[in-house]
Swiss-Prot record:
Residues of this chain annotated as glycosylated in UniProt: N57, N109, N200, N204, N228, N534
InterPro entries, sorted: GOST_TM (IPR053937), GPR107/GPR108-like (IPR009637)
Alphabetic keyword roster: Glycoprotein, Golgi apparatus, Host-virus interaction, Membrane, Signal, Transmembrane, Transmembrane helix
UniProt keyword annotation of Glycosyltransferase present: no
A GO biological process held by the record: negative regulation of toll-like receptor signaling pathway
Membrane topology: Multi-pass membrane protein
Comment block on domains: (Microbial infection) N- and C-terminal domains are required for AAV transduction.
This protein's record includes keyword RNA-binding: no
Cellular component terms per the entry's GO annotation: cis-Golgi network membrane; Golgi apparatus; Golgi membrane; membrane; trans-Golgi network
Annotated protein name in UniProt: Protein GPR108
Organism annotation: Homo sapiens
Family note: Belongs to the LU7TM family.
Pfam families: GOST_TM
Amino acid sequence: MAVSERRGLGRGSPAEWGQRLLLVLLLGGCSGRIHQLALTGEKRADIQLNSFGFYTNGSLEVELSVLRLGLREAEEKSLLVGFSLSRVRSGRVRSYSTRDFQDCPLQKNSSSFLVLFLINTKDLQVQVRKYGEQKTLFIFPGLLPEAPSKPGLPKPQATVPRKVDGGGTSAASKPKSTPAVIQGPSGKDKDLVLGLSHLNNSYNFSFHVVIGSQAEEGQYSLNFHNCNNSVPGKEHPFDITVMIREKNPDGFLSAAEMPLFKLYMVMSACFLAAGIFWVSILCRNTYSVFKIHWLMAALAFTKSISLLFHSINYYFINSQGHPIEGLAVMYYIAHLLKGALLFITIALIGSGWAFIKYVLSDKEKKVFGIVIPMQVLANVAYIIIESREEGASDYVLWKEILFLVDLICCGAILFPVVWSIRHLQDASGTDGKVAVNLAKLKLFRHYYVMVICYVYFTRIIAILLQVAVPFQWQWLYQLLVEGSTLAFFVLTGYKFQPTGNNPYLQLPQEDEEDVQMEQVMTDSGFREGLSKVNKTASGRELL
């Protein structure tokens, strides 16, 4: 069973579930770009530890503090375990879930960019093998010295020199890594050997990588492999604890995440301005305002607050490596409310609630009974994903749950719009109000197209963009999502603004006799020079 320091939900009573969800929210603030992953009883052959976009002079530090293989000493000496560091394409992380069980990544001779860290438990050393063009990718033993906490204090010296002969270790105390360099025929460093410590039936070592030039910049994926667990049914559980610290010259954020602080701050201001403008419209047209209009205002302000907290979180992650706990909790709460309000508002507008009717049908109530719990589940999945490490055993499961639930919600909110369109189509041919119903029908058809475009741009086009652009431009994915959301909000407000000439306010209130009398009076010229009075859905007259 794999466990992480950032736990999710488990079994228990509803009260315990609530407590654990709150615990997840609180611990979510601890996640950042300094990662600590602890797995016990793990049986996976390949563990995707993390991915990160590095610029020149960026650094990756890895400290394997615990590795217990759970086998006899003779069996451990023949194991094939280690790390791999590869440069992957933008928008994706290498997956080993479908590979052949006889194909071990640690035994590959690759012409592409790849670094292998082969753990040799027999000789107590870690052999580093490089493949591809890596002229300025520097690998050193130990961790980088920490910066002084106060100005004027001297920096602590590294406890391990970068190149030292020897590789033996002592089991009496925790020894330092002692690397050795083997020279190749050309005189260049071909294989770097790091010292491996063995203490209390556990192995440990550390290293750090520095990106030396622009040629080595890119999206890197760090993975752990235990090739002896590749054969199904013959897995042996092992324990591993690893610390990963990633940093770019300007902070702890990945290359694609650096612009997000400013992006989310600007978008938060845009949604705030849109919300204030919308409230001003409602205050000027109080006679035509429905409850759904105030719900739309609440959604705009909630979205703005959510983006504000998200922006602040990224600022502290970039400067400290982790966000502030209180702000992280506030962000998760705002995000949960925003997600629920968004789909509820879209579904209510699509059903025509308060616009063309005051009571939801049984079918529409069932849709809300599906969308609301699904949105709660989607937000719980999002919080768990944000608060757990990529290497956690259930990380991929929660990502799949989030994708599936979000897809179901996007499909479900279209049904009320379709039903409203059909209702107006049927009504236009039966109640004699063809002109009014056709105007409403056109309005809801436009809204249907808007919802389709919103889902298409934020779910499909955004993913394609993320795959297509280089690693440093991955933030365009968030720009497209937030920009599409803002455009959808503005267009929805424009289409359903509380003005007297809006089609949804022109609800027919007259019966058939009134229509006939109106026709007679018009034909006779009796009403010449008089203006027509329409009644709104609220029963109030608009001149």
